[in-house]
């Protein structure tokens, strides 16, 4: 074909312009436009966890000293600096700062550059926690740009996508200067806010990169017809180390016509991109097999003890799918298979006719994808003890003793030997980290663990069993974790643990029917817990796969390095069961007082008659839970950021959100933020609006408020005198000072 002179000139000029830049395009006449954006959870300008005060809100793309807005256009001709002091790389969603361009679905690409890691991990003395990262990224959709300036009381919700990352990640959470390269891919996302059953894979392919010695290296991300390639090479070298993942159409699920590729940083990282180039070519994408979410495998949990002091023995088990269970004793069937429902306790009573008996359980699921038989075997030994229903235990106890006060058992033997309705008496002393295995005895009453003296201290305790009462013990160094159900925890003190003090959670492989449910934590205290990352060490937590009916009542959480009470919920798990917190206090924790959810999952938690004082972030927070929360008769005093923050749902109107009654917000000194509450409110609530910016009349009557003294403790850890916070707040409630109802305009009174 012949071209007119003007056409030839145009082609020549365009070619020169393209050759003069670092971008080459085989399928497009016009070079893509590059832009900067920050989006997703924890990218808002108020996010401050492990962030230096002067860096709060920094999630910026900078070129030649200019910070890009979402409307600015750029290219790859100059170095690009990306700094993120918020966001996270989560299993089902991301919060990050992204320098990107949009490409059509019918092209492949190769993106590569030199990357200099200016800083990685928190700039404070905290350690990395594997939610920070930086590198190259391709994803099928963008999140909504974060609000700038931020509307008070609003924070960014999760932004989910299918994606592939060539990611710089912490090597081991111990060092800020040693990182590794990972290929991270996510598939199965069908909604922009995330969904259950999405899948993430993380594959390390270059380990132990020392940033002090080699802060600059080369990275590459490539889309081919059948997948993606991530690669790393030393600076100035073509000695690439690479990793491949199948599925080139992974990034065209939510948007069939386009995808987005570029450079990112998340949580706590700063990188500079230089010598960047993007090359595209026509794609002949090979269709992938439809994504199929991995289902929970059938699980048979033996809930019977390995020791028995009686000839009568209950064979017990739990399963996570409906089915049948058949029991064999010493090779002989004890009857035809019995039906069992997922989550229910299976029990069959037999007699032990010899000193040692062998059992086999055969479980055949009647639902789910895998209906093949599952077998498990165990043995039971008969033993003789002084009084099986009252077993004494000592740190120096021995398995061969009779369990009397003068001949105490060791803790492991006593746990296995204790029958339903019995009590395990703990002598004073320090007990090493202990596991109470799965058990389900209930017909003869609950089992009890309690001290006979004044100070029984466990250096970690894992309660996998159900129907236990745990009273009056102390936990330190390692957490008290509860994975069983129908347990009662009373008058327990947890302190100086390296993670959350007292936590109800479930393993990720058991399935919803076996999630921890109907546990009661009563009149307990948790304080001074601290994880090495300076995060994640809550006082109390009921989070990460919990069922219905868990209750915290009369708890005191203070001076923990994260939240006082944490009900966090991951998208990939689906909504947790509703939790009730009542008559509890959260004081001086480094994050929130009461964190009532997470990641946009709607759950109708309840918090009643509780107090949040001096927490370093928010007093009462929905933490992105848009569900029908019930928040009543609570007091928030002098929390650093918001006393109350309950955000507008991005999914539906206020009428489906929380119910708020008789809540009171107080400050002894002016705060920075108004309370921000969206939901169903009435005139019984008193929330703060800063007077200088308010046109609403404030009550004229005033009364001076004096903070009470801190609780004092003896060397034994017990309170010398009762705390007077509750009395203080009750008095303050009678003299509501500089308070009034505050609501979003769309929320009715």
UniProtKB/Swiss-Prot annotation:
| Keyword terms of this UniProt record | Calcium, Lyase, Metal-binding, Secreted, Signal
| Xref: InterPro entries | Pectin_lyas_fold (IPR012334), Pectin_lyase_fold/virulence (IPR011050), Polysaccharide_Lyase_9 (IPR052052)
KO phenotype (gene knockout): Mutant exhibits reduced growth on pectate, but retains pathogenicity on chrysanthemum.
According to the record, the signal peptide region is 1-26
Any idea where this protein resides? Answer: Secreted
Look at the named UniProt entry and state the broad enzyme category this protein falls under: lyase
Q: Which cofactor does it need?
A: Ca(2+)
Output the Gene Ontology cellular-component terms: extracellular region
Which residues bind Ca(2+) per the record? 538, 562-563, 566
Provide the reaction this enzyme catalyses: [(1->4)-alpha-D-galacturonosyl](n) = 4-(4-deoxy-alpha-D-galact-4-enuronosyl)-D-galacturonate + [(1->4)-alpha-D-galacturonosyl](n-2)
An example molecular function term from Gene Ontology annotations: metal ion binding
Q: Which residues are the active-site ones?
A: 595
Give the main localization category: secreted
Q: What is its EC number?
A: 4.2.2.9
| pH dependence as annotated | Optimum pH is 7.5-8.0.
**Regulation of catalytic or functional activity:** Activity on pectate is nearly completely inhibited by ethyleneglycol-bis-(P-aminoethyl ether) N,N'-tetraacetic acid (EGTA), EDTA or nitrilotriacetic acid. Activity is specifically restored by the addition of Ca(2+).
Say what the protein does. Exo-cleaving lyase that catalyzes the digestion of pectate. Contributes to pectate catabolism but not to bacterial virulence. In vitro can also use citrus pectin and highly methyl-esterified Link pectin as substrates.
For this chain, the family text in UniProt reads: Belongs to the polysaccharide lyase 9 family.
Q: This chain belongs to which protein, by name?
A: Pectate disaccharide-lyase
User: What is the protein's species of origin?
Assistant: Dickeya chrysanthemi
- The gene behind this protein is pelX
């Amino acid at each position: 074909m012949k071209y007119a002179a003007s056409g030839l000139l145009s082609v020549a000029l365009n070619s020169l312009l393209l050759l003069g830049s670092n971008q080459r395009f085989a399928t497009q006449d016009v070079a893509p436009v590059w832009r900067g954006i920050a989006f997703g959870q924890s990218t808002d300008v108020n996010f401050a966890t492990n962030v230096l005060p002067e860096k709060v809100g920094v999630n910026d793309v900078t070129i030649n000293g200019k910070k890009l807005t979402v409307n600015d256009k750029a290219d790859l001709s100059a170095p690009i600096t990306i700094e993120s002091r918020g966001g996270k790389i989560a299993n089902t969603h991301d919060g990050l700062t992204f320098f990107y361009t949009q490409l059509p679905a019918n092209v492949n690409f190769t993106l590569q550059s030199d990357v200099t890691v200016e800083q990685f991990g928190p700039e404070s003395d905290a350690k990395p926690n594997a939610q920070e990262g930086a590198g190259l990224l391709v994803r099928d959709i963008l999140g909504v740009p974060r609000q700038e300036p931020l509307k008070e009381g609003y924070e960014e919700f999760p932004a989910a996508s299918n994606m592939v990352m060539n990611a710089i990640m912490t090597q081991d959470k111990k060092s800020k200067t040693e990182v590794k390269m990972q290929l991270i891919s996510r598939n199965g996302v069908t909604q922009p806010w995330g969904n259950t059953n999405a899948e993430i894979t993380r594959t390390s392919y270059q380990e132990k990169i020392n940033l002090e010695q080699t802060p600059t290296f080369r990275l590459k991300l490539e889309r081919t017809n059948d997948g993606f390639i991530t690669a790393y090479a030393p600076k100035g070298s073509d000695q690439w180390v690479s990793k491949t993942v199948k599925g080139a159409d992974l990034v065209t699920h939510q948007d069939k016509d386009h995808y987005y590729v570029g450079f990112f940083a998340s949580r706590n990282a700063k990188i500079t991109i230089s010598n960047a180039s993007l090359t595209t070519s026509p794609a002949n994408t090979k269709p992938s097999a439809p994504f199929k979410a991995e289902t929970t495998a059938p699980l048979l949990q033996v809930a019977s003890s390995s020791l028995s002091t009686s000839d009568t023995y209950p064979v017990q088990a739990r399963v996570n799918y409906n089915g049948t269970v058949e029991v064999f004793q010493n090779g002989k069937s004890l009857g035809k298979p019995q039906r069992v429902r997922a989550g229910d306790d299976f029990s069959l009573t037999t007699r032990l006719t010899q000193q040692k008996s062998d059992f086999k359980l055969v479980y055949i699921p009647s639902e789910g994808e895998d209906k093949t038989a599952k077998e498990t075997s165990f043995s039971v030994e008969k033993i003789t003890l002084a009084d099986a229903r009252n077993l004494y235990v000592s740190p120096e106890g021995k398995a061969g003793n009779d369990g009397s006060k003068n001949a105490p058992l060791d803790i492991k033997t006593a746990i296995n030997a204790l029958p339903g309705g019995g009590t395990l008496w703990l002598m004073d002393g320090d007990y090493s980290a202990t596991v109470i295995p799965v058990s389900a005895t209930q017909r003869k009453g609950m089992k009890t663990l309690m001290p006979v003296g004044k100070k029984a201290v466990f250096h970690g305790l894992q309660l996998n069993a159900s129907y236990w009462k745990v009273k009056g013990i102390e936990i330190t160094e390692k957490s008290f974790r509860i994975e069983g159900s129908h347990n009662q925890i009373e008058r327990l003190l947890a302190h100086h643990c390296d993670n959350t003090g007292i936590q109800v959670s479930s393993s990720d492989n058991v399935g919803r029917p076996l999630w921890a449910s109907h546990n009661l934590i009563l009149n307990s205290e948790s304080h001074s817990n601290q994880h090495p990352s300076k995060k994640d060490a809550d006082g109390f937590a009921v989070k990460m796969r919990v069922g219905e009916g868990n209750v915290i009542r009369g708890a005191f959480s203070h001076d923990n390095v994260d939240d006082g009470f944490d009900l966090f919920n991951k998208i990939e798990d689906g909504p947790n069961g509703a939790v009730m917190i009542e008559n509890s206090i959260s004081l001086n924790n480094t994050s929130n007082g009461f964190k009532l959810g997470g990641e946009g999952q709607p759950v109708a938690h309840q918090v009643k008659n509780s107090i949040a004082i001096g927490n370093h972030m928010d007093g009462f927070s929905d933490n992105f839970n848009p569900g029908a929360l019930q928040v009543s008769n609570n007091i928030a005093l002098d929390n650093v950021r918001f006393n109350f923050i309950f955000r507008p749902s991005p999914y539906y109107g206020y009428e489906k959100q929380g119910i708020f009654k008789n809540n009171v917000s107080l400050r002894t000194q002016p705060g920075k933020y108004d309370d921000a509450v969206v939901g169903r409110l009435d005139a019984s609530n008193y929330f703060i609006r800063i007077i200088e910016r308010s046109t609403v009349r404030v009550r004229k009557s005033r009364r001076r408020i004096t903070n009470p003294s801190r609780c004092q403790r003896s060397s034994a850890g017990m309170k010398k005198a009762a705390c007077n916070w509750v009395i203080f707040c009750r008095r303050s409630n009678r003299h509501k000072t500089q308070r009034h109802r505050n609501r979003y305009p769309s929320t009715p009174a």
